Structure formats: structure tokens, C-alpha cells
Amino acid sequence: MKTREVVFYSEGAKMVGDIYLPDDYKEGEKRPAVLCNSGWTGVNKCYPALFARALTARGFVCMGFDYRGFKPSENVHPCLPKYTTLETEVEDVANAFTFMQIQPEVDSERCGLLGWGVGGAVCVNVAARDKEVKAIATLNSFVNGE
């Protein structure tokens, strides 16, 4: 798996992530893509990177990132749980999904979401709002916090 660091912005905050490419990827190709999402803690190097390893081996381009408030993305706050909500994570994932779609390696017509735990609930919320999401998978998830 090849990795390329990316930076984008979500609601004014700098977000840091990675594009994960299959080993056999050739420049100029457009591949289906999956935005891989972590649970509540929003850490890219954990579940998103693990999911990307499995999916890139099957030919997908993947992207993972650290949610707003989790290093190395911006707006880290000492009382993070108070300021990080399902809605802020939905905003971040929606913005990341749009960013992923415009990457040169990505077939923007074949993009989906994958989420673990709270990340799964976030993916369900994003997919319900964005018709560009063509597929969704959740693991160990719930639909809402009520």
C-alpha cells in the first residue's frame, strides 16, 4: 500500500489525512474509493489505516483522516468531548468525502463510506444527506445517540 499525506479544511479547521493507494496503482488511473472512518476518537492511524490496507489490496483507493480536534488536525481542545459532537464529525466526514472525490486517483462516481463505532453512525448520517455516496458499510455501530 502506498500512502500520500493530504490536507484539507472542514468548517475552517485544517484536517490532516492520508490517501492510500493499491500497490499496483498506475498514475492516471481512476479507481473506486472508500473514505475509512474511525470511531469517536477519530484517529486515522488506527482503524482507517487498517481498513485501507485490506481495501487497497482489493484495488480500492482509500482515504483516512483525523477528525477535527484530534492531532494532527486543528482545533485540539483540552475539553475535547464537550466540543466534539456527532454533528461536528458528520461535517468533517462530509467535507472529507467531497475532498476525496476530487483526488486525481478517484473515480468520483464510485465512492463510498466505511465507519467503525461512532464513525459508522457518522457515515449513516452523511450518506442520508449526500446522494454522491454510492455505498456504505458500518462495523460495531449505531444509528444515533438518542
Regions found by a protein language model. Name each.
Residues 95-146:
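Primarily recognizes the serine-hydrolase "nucleophile elbow" in alpha/beta-hydrolase
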